[in-house]
Amino acid sequence: MRFRFTWRRESDSAAVSAHETGALTSRSESTRALVLALEAFEREPTNADALREAVEQCNRLRDFGQAHDLLLTATEIQPWLVATLVADTYLAAGDFEHELAARREASEANPGRGDLKFKLIRARIRAGQLDEARQEITRLELAHPAAAAWMLRIDLLNAEQRRGDALLAAIDAFEEAPDEVRRYRLLLRQALTCLRKDGDPMAARKAHEILDELGEDRLGDPLSVILAIRVAVAVGREETVRALIDLLPSDTEQKEVLRTRAWLAHRDGDLGQARKIWRHLGNHSPMPSQRVCGAEELERRDGNLLPPAGDEIRLYTVVRNELWRLQWFVSYYRKLGVDRFFFVDNDSSDGSLAWLLEQPDVHVFHAGGSYAEAASGTVWLNQLVREHSPSGWQLYVDVDEALVFADIENHGLRGLTEYMERKGHDLAAGQMVDMFSMEAHQPSDDRFEDDFVSRYPFFSHEFERTQSVVCPYFFTVGGIRQLAGFGENNTKTPLARGGREIQYLSSSHMVTPGVVSDVGVALLHYKLVGDFLADFRRDVAENHRVSHCTRRYEAYIEFFETWGGDLSQIYPASVDRYSSSRSLLDHGLVTPLPEDFRTHAE
């Protein structure tokens, strides 16, 4: 079936409304922009531009239901365009499977349009259909030589975890046409990707080269300036960041620019200004984890007395079918000094809920909703922390994580919190350290694993860090899972002071601003334990995680299946055996305790 289509604006009134909403969005007035866009489409329901603007505003606010309703009513708009906007909405929601179906529908309706084919191939890459994408890239190059297939080949290399090759391809593409802005932007993005996900020395050298050669021709493009700022942050060139950000209008409110201004305020010691900027971002351009938690989302199940927070150390976490870990987990943190536990149980069916309800120091909240829609449970935990930790200390760890810092065996958590309180520190940060065994282990007959630390004693000590504009201000990659090539951020901020406006933005990988302690911590990470391959397969099959997490688990399965789950076959040279916190200290994975920490403790 053939569809007629045009990108021409159909009236001046729609053009004015689109201009107004664009200006408002640049000031982060997203709600008002949405109202204007909806009014414009209501006036002209046959106007494709008005529909597009309204859907884009809905997606910016993550109001996907309203976007869907709008598209259902757009019966007088070209079907291929509606399909494209449906795909854009699925993409904004992170639903790559349905995005792909909608892109296919739009492209099949207009087989002669190279731009729609381009978007379809990108959707295939996002959905993991890499072989199909590779074949279609070749066909696209033949049918549409000007379609910039080199961009798709770089996307494909990244999806195959071949980021170094993608950087080389980006360099080649840039050198072919150095005056082309999109090639320059892509080179900046790829250098940043390699820096963050791999700590790649070649990417670092290229980043410095790019920054050293910035000229007037590059500085006139705001997006290139913003990308250059991100690269400069990653390689620690603060003065370059300051020089570049001064080139942008002072009232620029693009998200990355605001985050950078908050980072610079932190660097200048102005925590109040950093927090003010992040409050503004949270009010106008919130991350999914910052949405309001509905009253119906959490239902308290325990009957234990819940006193005021006082100076308690309170632990918060989410569980789903983790019975075999719970006894060890709760025991470990009780010994460290946790006073009270807050568990969100996300529909466990293995007895986890019953076991938790038997514990006198545990409070249990049931969440029957989607873990993914709650931003990996972060929405729930932010709500509980707001309600139950207005003072004292909050510890956010997963049930496969064991907190460690230098000499923790002698000081416990209370020794750390007392030091942090005396110093005015809000946060303790560090990284996950993947632990594993050289032989398979299964839980004992009573269904509990009682000692992860001794059963899974090995770890890889190779890690790389780059700077970040989001607290705790660094991005960490490394550990044995890095061999799978996914480049996961291992940074964690497990300990925070209550009542200090700390919000979790991406689990505890990123948080809102606070004073980060000079005591660096680590989390022993027991993910590669038990029959972890079966756990990963079940996790993917249940599909309760956000899309990028599901893809990461798929990458783990593909990599570790190569070795049959036998980690002794991998054994990188950087492996050591954990015996105490000293094992991490020797490799720089935790920091030495400051002298006045010891003096105070004594």
Cite the ranges covered by each PLM segment.
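Start-of-helix register in tetratricopeptide repeats
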Residues: 15, 49, 81-84, 115, ...
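Register position in tetratricopeptide repeats
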Residues: 26, 60, 92, 126, ...
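Short coil turns that delineate tetratricopeptide repeat
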Residues: 45, 77-79, 111, 144-145, ...
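Active-site-proximal specificity loops/subdomain of glycosyltransferases
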Residues: 353-396, 404-409
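Catalytic-site signature of metal-activated, phosphate-bearing donor transferases
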Residues: 377, 405-602
